[in-house]
Amino acid sequence: MPKVYIIDSPVPNAFATGRNPEHAAVAVTTALANALDKDEIEGVLAHELSHVKHGDILIGTIAASMAGIITTLSHWGMFFGGGDRDRNSSSSAIVGLAMMILAPLAAGIIQMAVSRSREYMADKSGGELSGNPDALADALLKIESYAKNRTMPGATENTAHMFIICPFSAKDMKQLFSTHPSTADRVARLRAQAKAMRSSGGAK
């Protein structure tokens, strides 16, 4: 069982970290503990434990690393690529510039797609684990209502994928490249899951 840590922060959020279940930890902020009720906190913890169970931390780290490598290689290709014959070619320069712009964008899109798919999976698995998808949906709405007005201190683009809700405020330009699906979509899926579980007698 991963250890659970409380981080002193004015912004409600949570994340899991660790390369595998044996070396993993889950962290929640003090603001989250104060803002959510018991069922909602259980839903958040179930979501994060699902990330641990499915190895999402390692997958997210690999995706972020690959995006960084692709970006770096595209920059190197611009400055060091091409033979002497093409070094002064305008067409070569145009291709190099296009690669420098498009490669990082493509890498970022791939990273976002991977991260978003893992968030959906963790929501579904977390709802099953807690037996209360509605509580997790309520938690996501509460966390976003706080987080959208304030960027979490210490949050970076390299760690954003780890959090249950994007740690950047709605005014932050980094929000445009969020690694998270829209909260509204996640909530809709969780509501549908809860309805299905109630129909089968499996939801709280």
Language model regions located:
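Polar-ligand-bearing catalytic/cofactor-coordination segments
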Residues: M1-S92, L105-K204
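Anionic-ligand binding region
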Residues: I94-G96
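Hydrophobic alpha-helical transmembrane segments of integral membrane proteins
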Residues: M100-I101
